[in-house]
């Protein structure tokens, strides 16, 4: 992780290090020991833990499920047990994460 005026997330996939602007990241999804950083045009897969990623990216992201960490600015709306991203993708929201997710989305809307 790396912070500058233009905040970015640095991840390593194999021998390659990628600098991904925070504003381009839609969400992170974990599957076992692998985490995928998903942008509009690409997925970057690396080994890690979602809890570690959450600590590194900070308050712009909220945990919506055991496997998903979403950038609040990428969310269009919350419907039932899902969030709908601005590009139409739907991600599950666990019942235990709904209150904190709703609060984070509301805060992002008020501050944005």
Segments predicted by a language model, with ranges:
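C-terminal output/interaction extensions
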Residues: 100-112
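Conserved binding/recognition cores within well-folded domains
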Residues: 1-93
């Amino acid at each position: 992780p790396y912070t500058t005026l233009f905040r970015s997330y640095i991840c390593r996939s194999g021998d390659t290090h990628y600098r991904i602007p925070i504003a381009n990241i839609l969400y992170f999804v974990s599957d076992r020991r692998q985490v995928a950083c998903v942008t509009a045009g690409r997925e970057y897969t690396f080994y890690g833990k979602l809890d570690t990623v959450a600590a590194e990216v900070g308050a712009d992201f909220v945990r919506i499920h055991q496997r998903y960490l979403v950038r609040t600015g990428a969310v269009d709306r919350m419907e039932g047990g899902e969030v709908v991203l601005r590009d139409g993708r739907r991600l599950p929201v666990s019942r235990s994460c709904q209150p904190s997710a709703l609060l984070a989305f509301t805060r992002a809307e008020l501050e944005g």
